[in-house]
Amino acid sequence: MLLALKKIGGRYRRFRDTVRQRILPKLRCTHDPLKLRVADFKKSDTLYVLASGGSINDLPPQAWDDIRRCDSLGINFWLYHEHVPTWFSCEVSRTPADAATLMQVLEKRLPDYANTAFLLKDIHKLDERYPQWNSEFPLSQIRHFYALHSLSVKGRTVAALRRALRWDRALGGFKKSEELWALPMKRATVFLAMSFGLMAGYKRIVLCGVDLSNSAYFYDHPRYREARGLPEAPTLPSSAEALEQRYASEGVKMLKMPDPTIHNTIDPALNPLPMDEIIHAFHDEVLRPEGVELFVALPSSRLFPRIPALYAAV
């Protein structure tokens, strides 16, 4: 255990030094971007996690009333949607074209997001993933900028993951805190969002657009980019052969031919541990024992019925 803590400490120090030396000089904010004070932004006990699944377009008016009344956290290309969340988290894609699109959309939406807290993970990987970040990433324009360290959760099988989650929880890895500097992470940003919801003290987390049942996105509808003159959103190839070629060009290791009809986080070609099982494990081993309720917005999510739905589709 002591060795593991030393490793975490060493990684964080390298992360902290990178942020202070390379990121902090570009910021105009007066706060420390390595320490997030939750109370500065949190105004509700419910957190709506806003992902990009196509079911976002099926949410009923009651859901939007609740989302506007409570806190929300937008993920990655949520920027295409008109709703401005309390929190926003993104990571820079390994695909240069996708990274460039994210930067373009981010810059256009920054005036709308003036009061939103940005939680940026893997910020120390900008040199690798987006070399031109030094001149093109609008860091200085982000008023509430925070760089959070990602703590990797171990486990390559469901059983191993559940053991790791129980162990991490016992060691205080998911402890609630008024000031956050790091968040546990497993594969996808939605896990980080749930970790954040728990550690920031939310009592209820609602997953919106976490469909996992198909490869559709809400921003596939042209109205989202046309309304604000945004660039076309990135898409994955629709054929297995083209998708395989795309992944290979990015250095992604595949166990077999990928399936373009399903969400990439549940594709066994990419990882034998699907994202839905990761979410269920986190719910069972961490959220429920900590007294945090987890819901999906709509029953069309692959997570339903093991995780209950709050609304019916319009």
Language model segments and positions:
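Metal-ion/cofactor- or nucleotide/acyl-coenzyme-handling active-site neighborhoods
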Residues: 2-314
